[in-house]
Each structure stands twice: as C-alpha cells, then as structure tokens.
Amino acid sequence: MLSIRPKWVEKIASGEKTIEVRKTRPKLKTPFKAYLYVTAGNLSYRCPNGMICHCNGGRAVIGEFVCNKVDWITQIGFSGSPVPSRYSICSHSNMSVLPINDLLYAARLTYPELVDYLAGGEGYGWHISGLRIYDAPRKLSEFTGLRDTRFGAAPYGIKRAPQSWCYVEAMEEEETK
C-alpha cells in the first residue's frame, strides 16, 4: 500500500502519471499488486472510465494497480571527475545504463525535483499498469498489514497510513468490485 498526496493521485487516476518514484521498494518479484492510499486533502479526479470521483478529506484507499516493473535509479559518474554525476536508470541484470528522461516524464517530475527527493541516494521507479479506481473509497481498517518477522510475515490491523508504503494482504477480487 502506497501513501500518495492528492495532487499525485489525480495524475495517476487520470492516467497521466504512470511511474511512482520511491526511495525504497518491496522485496517482491514483479508483477505485484499495490493499493493507492490518498493522504489528507480533498480530491476530485476523472477516473480512466470517465466518471468524476470525489474523496473529501482524503485518508482512504481509492484504487489499486499492478506494478509490472521497477526501475533502479542511481547516480552515475566518475570519482574525481569535474563532471558531476547524474541520475540514470540502471539494470541489475545486465548493468546497462539508460537516460532518465522518459522516467521523469512518466513520473511527472523534473530533474531538480528528483535530485531534491532522493538527496544523493538511490531510488526506484514503480511502473503503474492495470490501474483500477474503486467506485467508493475504502477505509484503511479494511486492509490487513503484513509485518516481517524472523518467522515470516505476521498479519496486523492497520491503524494509520504508512509513511511511504507497507506490505498488505491482497484483497479478494469480489471484495474490491
């Protein structure tokens, strides 16, 4: 479950924003399901199906998507070089390096915004596919969180929104319709 500010949720719900940049990522193989929790604030947005949705006060889960790919964002440069390092997309599998321009466009971020957010660290671009906006927002209490323990994942009742994201049990399909 991802906590996202209303202005970004509007862009995701409209299909304008197709990548969400985060400092961390789940230890899951892609594809995986992610739920969209909108933080405090009023939200009116046009869903992909054309209807206008309202979420007054925020603080609700408004939809879900499948993350089918996660890009690794890191700084590339040469130690001691007068040329400053720049953020790029790197592949763990073949160590190829790609320019970050397309990711920034899909995430609706500028390069300075990315630099400010990552503050010299690494990041991850979560690709959004199969977006589904619910007819009615869902309460946080309807979801079960999963906490990592030395014995495996332990379920717990979610009482407050995650700072960035948290693991949750997937809801059954008939429950999300």
Language-model segments: which ranges?
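Structured alpha/beta reader/binder surfaces that contact nucleic acids or chromatin modification marks
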Residues: M1-K177
